[in-house]
Curated annotation (Swiss-Prot):
Primary location recorded for the protein, binned into one broad class: nucleus
Described purpose of this protein according to its UniProt entry: E3 ubiquitin ligase that plays an important role in regulating cardiac development and contractility, muscle growth, metabolism, and fiber-type differentiation. Acts as a critical factor that regulates cardiomyocyte size during development in concert with TRIM63 by regulating E2F1-mediated gene expression. Plays a role in apoptosis induction in cardiomyocytes by promoting ubiquitination of the DUSP1 phosphatase. Promotes non-canonical NF-kappa-B signaling and B-cell-mediated immune responses by mediating NFKB2 'Lys-48'-linked ubiquitination and processing.
UniProt cross-references to SUPFAM superfamilies, sorted A to Z: B-box zinc-binding domain, RING/U-box
Subcellular location: Nucleus; Cytoplasm
Gene3D superfamilies tied to this protein: 1.20.5.170, Classic Zinc Finger, Zinc/RING finger domain, C3HC4 (zinc finger)
Organism: Homo sapiens
Keywords, ordered alphabetically: Coiled coil, Cytoplasm, Metal-binding, Muscle protein, Nucleus, Transferase, Zinc, Zinc-finger
Name the UniProt record assigns to this protein: Tripartite motif-containing protein 55
Record PTM: Targeted for degradation through the proteasomal and lysosomal pathways in the presence of SUMO3.
GO biological processes: diapedesis; innate immune response; leukocyte migration involved in inflammatory response; macrophage migration; positive regulation of non-canonical NF-kappaB signal transduction; protein K48-linked ubiquitination; signal transduction
Compositional bias ranges of the Acidic residues kind: 328-339, 347-360
Example of a GO cellular component annotation carried by this entry: microtubule
Zn finger region (B box-type): 103-145
Gene that produces this protein: TRIM55
Length: 548
């Protein structure tokens, strides 16, 4: 306990000496005052040498000798409080010396030069002659050996002072290291928090700027809309004012003319001569009659001056504006996910519908439809004849049967001729125009005539010219195919005659117009299982015989 008290007293004395030294520092040279020390009128102290230097710096034009100002009088400012010090004819030597400060400086120098007392070994408080050499573990205080043998610590456990010293010193060192590490971590956290504060300020500033820009944009829209609506009201105002002012001008002119007539009539009433009066009265009466009959007062409608139809109701907009608030990103993400799911479902259904439409369009398209206008017209006729139910028929007899192509695919490289060069000609009676379909297909001179109609064998997509180019012996197979196709065509014609309610578009699907005479058909896209499905082809080569 005495050692701790001695240490505390020593530390207090050292602190007192340090504070005293701070008070004895000159504000000019920043060292301890040197004699003589002068006191200024403001009660601050300076070294006389420092006071002379500052006085000379404040009065550089005064003559000096040996670094001392010779002229009498002058002034300078206190370096501590900036108070102006006025000197008499003695200059800085006229300032009073501060003997108290000089004595304190002497005492301080004596104390500071005195050798330090060596710290003695601490002694026990109960046994003043015994040194403290053991440490009581129960009471946790240092004590002496006599206290352990006879004193208050005889029943306590003790340990050598050096062991406890080393242990507590290591514990203190570890604690200091832990505190230093903790301080480093805390300092890092503080740095992160400071960065977070800066980031928050920057983000808030950015969001405020964006918010202000958006509201400024809304202000601009409102201002623009206000100007537009104001212009509408202004235009209506100008139109109505122009109309009313035109009426005012019209009525004013009429009033002026009538006033002139009235004035002329009053003057004419004073005419004493009856003959003169009668000569001019007729003209005046005619003018008065015309003025009274021709003028019609145009009244303004009731409420013409009101502008109630320009009233604006902003209750809904006000409600919307008051509901403006910040949105959360979580809600937007959920809405976007829901919208994407709906779009995917619609896309799947729509994709199937688009595929079906594309297949129908592919089946109903005719190749080379836009290449030649004449060919397009002939193809349109083919479409109309391919749908007998779409045209009015005068007689129940069906049109002449046209042999379609056989369903079996033709081998690649085999070419079947078209027109009058194909197969054996046979005389078939051509029905009259009245007995057939639309008379546009059969002219008037065609009635009752018989022409040689030819039966066209199927035209394969692989045909590239006229005439038989295939391998020998293909004629018999073509004739057999033509017979089979004719039988199938008659069955189809019978079925189509019964089903007259079918639309024309359905009869066009799956049919393709045959190539014109002298023009090669498009090559087949494939053969075997990869080739296109068989198409029913109508041939109208019997129309070519009409040119004969």
């Amino acid at each position: 306990m005495s050692a701790s008290l001695n240490y505390k007293s020593f530390s207090k004395e050292q602190q007192t000496m340090d504070n005293l030294e701070k008070q004895l520092i000159c504000p000019i040279c920043l060292e301890m005052f040197t004699k003589p020390v002068v006191i200024l009128p403001c009660q601050h102290n300076l070294c006389r040498k420092c006071a002379s230097d500052i006085f000379q710096a404040s009065n550089p034009y005064l003559p000096t000798r040996g670094g001392t100002t010779m002229a009498s009088g002058g002034r300078f400012r206190c370096p501590s409080c900036r108070h102006e010090v006025v000197l008499d004819r003695h200059g800085v030597y006229g300032l009073q010396r501060n003997l108290l400060v000089e004595n304190i400086i002497d005492i301080y120098k004596q104390e500071s030069t005195r050798p330090e007392k060596k710290s003695d070994q601490p002694m026990c408080e109960e046994h003043e002659e015994e040194r403290i050499n053991i440490y009581c573990l129960n009471c946790e205080v240092p004590t002496c050996s006599l206290c352990k043998v006879f004193g208050a610590h005889k029943d306590c456990q003790v340990a050598p002072l050096t062991h406890v010293f080393q242990r507590q010193k290591s514990e203190l060192s570890d604690g200091i290291a832990i505190l230093v590490g903790s301080n480093d971590r805390v300092q890092g956290v503080i740095s992160q928090l400071e960065d977070t504060c800066k980031t928050i300020e920057e983000c808030c500033r950015k969001q405020k700027q964006e918010l202000c820009e958006k509201f400024d944009y809304l202000y601009g829209i409102l201002e623009e809309r206000k100007n537009e609506m104001t212009q509408v009201i202004t235009r209506t105002q100008e139109e109505k004012l122009e109309h009313v002012r035109a009426l005012i001008k019209k009525y004013s002119d009429h009033l002026e003319n009538v006033s002139k007539l009235v004035e002329s009539g009053i003057q004419f009433m004073d005419e004493p001569e009856m003959a003169v009066f009668l000569q001019n009265a007729k003209t005046l009466l005619k003018k008065i009659s015309e003025a009274s009959k021709a003028f019609q007062m145009e009244k303004i409608e009731h409420g013409y001056e009101n502008m109630n139809h320009f009233t604006v109701n902003l209750n809904r907009e006000e409600k919307i504006i008051r509901e403006i608030d910040f949105y959360r990103e979580d809600e937007d993400e959920e809405e976007e996910e829901g919208g994407e799911g709906e779009k995917e479902g619609e896309g799947e259904v729509g994709g199937e519908a688009v595929e079906v439409e594309e297949v129908e369009n592919v089946q109903t398209e005719f190749p080379g439809e836009d290449e030649n206008p004449e060919k397009a017209s002939e193809l349109s006729q083919v479409e109309l004849q391919a749908a007998p139910g779409a045209l009015p028929v005068s007689s129940p007899e069906p049109p002449p049967a046209l042999p379609p192509a056989a369903d079996a695919p033709v081998t690649q490289g085999e070419v079947v001729p078209t027109g009058s060069e194909q197969t054996t000609e046979s005389e078939t009676p051509v029905p009259a125009a009245a007995e057939t379909a639309d008379p546009l297909f059969y002219p008037s001179w065609y009635k009752g005539q018989t022409r040689k109609a030819t039966t066209n064998p199927p035209c394969t997509p692989g045909s590239e010219g006229l005439g038989q180019i295939g391998p020998p012996g293909s004629e018999d197979s073509n004739v057999r195919k033509a017979e089979v196709a004719a039988a199938a065509a008659s069955e189809r014609a019978a079925v189509s005659g019964k089903e007259t309610s079918a639309p024309a578009a359905t009869s066009q699907i799956g049919f393709e117009a045959p190539p014109l005479q002298g023009q090669a058909a498009a090559p087949a896209s494939g053969s075997g299982a990869d080739s296109e499905p068989a198409r029913h082809i109508f041939s109208f080569s019997w129309l070519n015989s009409l040119n004969e």
